[in-house]
From Swiss-Prot:
InterPro entries: DnaK_N (IPR037187), YteA (IPR014240), Znf_DskA_TraR (IPR000962). SUPFAM superfamilies: DnaK suppressor protein DksA, alpha-hairpin domain (SSF109635). Residues 133-158 have a biased composition (Acidic residues). The lineage of its organism: Bacteria, Bacillati, Bacillota, Bacilli, Bacillales. This is Uncharacterized protein YteA. A zinc finger (dksA C4-type) spans 94-114. Residues 133-182 are annotated as: Disordered. The keyword Metal-binding applies. One of its GO terms (molecular function) is zinc ion binding. PANTHER family: GENERAL STRESS PROTEIN 16O (PTHR33823:SF4), RNA POLYMERASE-BINDING TRANSCRIPTION FACTOR DKSA-RELATED (PTHR33823). Keywords: Metal-binding, Zinc, Zinc-finger.
Amino acid sequence: MLTKEQLQHLKNELEQTKKDILNRFKDNDHFQLNSAFPYDSWGELSAYDNHPGDQATELYEREKDIALDLHEREHLRDIEHSLKAIENGTYGICEVSGKEIPFERLEALPTATTLAEYSSQDVVSKDRPIEEETPFGQFEFDDDEEIRAPYDSEDSYQDVEKYGNSQTPQDMENPPLSYDDMTMNAEENIGNTESYENFIATDITGKEITVYQSRAHERYEEELDEEGIMTTFGDLHAD
């Protein structure tokens, strides 16, 4: 059973902590959460000329302020709950077992409402977020005769890589002539079946075949010359 001196000592601690929290809220305007982000918080009139990455520090500080404000609000709520329990004469009684909470525990944690063995256990999860898991067991299936995956990890990477990567010609063992050739398997056909479909076109009626000069067309001609043929789908005999 808590003595009057012990109870008064704990009450004074709770009231002083409550006063400190309210003063902090007043001094820092609730961690500046009442200020508009990002303009009022870091003085910029506009964010149009700033890359989103340039606001990473400000965003991190904003997120931290939100977490600190939430922590202080929860602490303040626990303090008010304990002060109300003192008024009701139930302070120092475990809300689970109904037994008295030792003074030593209350002195260390004045907002304690249960015995140590009944306190909530905050277990930190060791599970990693789903985006860190490997989406496929194998990166590509091109070399596997038994598996013909229509869409594998390589395709996923290429879909993202088309928006750009950090590679430069100096990083390559055989530097390409064009930045368009920096991507993985840049020479493979995309959106067509035959390699010549990259540089030919027809009009709306399917007639008037046009050949466009391009790197793909040059490579196609070189391959035909190396093989000594005129087409990849069967040789053509000149009249």
